[in-house]
Amino acid sequence: MIAFDPRSTEERVRIVDLHPDLGDIRAEATDGLRRNQKKLPCKYFYDALGARLFEAITELPEYYPTRTELGIMNASVHEMAEAIGGHATLVEFGSGVGLKTQKLLDALIEPTGVVLVDISRAALEASAYQLADRYDDMEVIAVCADYTQALRLPRPNRPSARTVAFFPGSTIGNFTHPEAISFLGRVAELVGRGGGLLVGIDRRKDTEVIENAYNDSLGVTAAFNLNILRRLNESGANFDLGKFRHHAPFLEHEGRIEMRLISEVEQSVRVGTSSFSLQAGEHIVTEHSHKYDLSQFEDMARSAGFRLTKHWSDARDWFSVCFLEVDDD
């Protein structure tokens, strides 16, 4: 339930551009391909085609994370809202257009405002005005920034009881463990004393279930993975996409899926003025997705200054939504 705010949509939307470094795909790819284990930066998956492909992935029967997390929120969002409490400021790391964000905002008790943080200004502006139209009684602040870096965020004009961040989608699993702990530590500083974080995590489970989710029978994930090579070709590379295949094994010891592009033949590729040789069967790593035991994630959160106070899971314990609160002791 949200209190009425008589200001117009335009008056309730604030756009703050921190001018994030958008990166140089060619330079970052060149650096990654020079390493002993060749890799490419996963942030370049998401051009317009990549975003559409990922949306299609979330609808696949094998891909359980999205629908499982949404099911948890459908069942428990009012308990989540009670844990957050009334008159909170919600900070979402993302553009805020998803169903999960709307479900949470619908359940929150008179939130003072929502702060969206995303690197794409165009996506932010569009979603900020959509949210302001939907919630005609709440201030929306859109911050164009890289949320993986240290930030100081603007606050809504109305006083807030606490600040709570929202990070759904098991996106935290794309970080290495040290990176995840560093990110959680920055979030703890961002939300401050009394603050919290509602975060989705993908749980450890049967290896076949995990691998099927990232190696779907229709080949949509393969197209998504190969799209990064197409993007590089737009920037002066010469990858032949037909000479690569997608594979995403689960690495048991590391507890993560590893997205790979495997060279089908011995070949040489060019990125800008740099050339790289690949042996037949050699792979390029494009993304990691860590799966957690709940106790493991609790230890990581504690290392970052949080304590796990509540969590909600599906009946099979495939996925959990965790509520962390800043440990003020």
Predicted segments — roles?
Residues 1-44, 51:
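N-terminal auxiliary segments of SAM/dcSAM-dependent transferases
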Residues 37-84:
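Class I SAM-dependent methyltransferase Rossmann-like catalytic core
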Residues 87-96:
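Conserved class I S-adenosyl-L-methionine
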Residues 97-110:
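Conserved SAM-binding loop of SAM-dependent methyltransferases across substrates and taxa
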Residues 117-122:
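Conserved SAM/SAH-binding beta-strand->alpha-helix loop
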Residues 181-193:
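A short glycine-rich, Lys/Arg-flanked "PGG" loop and its adjoining helix->strand segment in the class I
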Residues 190-204:
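Conserved beta-strand signature within the Rossmann-like core of class I S-adenosyl-L-methionine
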Residues 209-294, 298-304:
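Substrate-binding/catalytic lobe of Class I Rossmann-like enzymes that use SAM or dcSAM, i.e.
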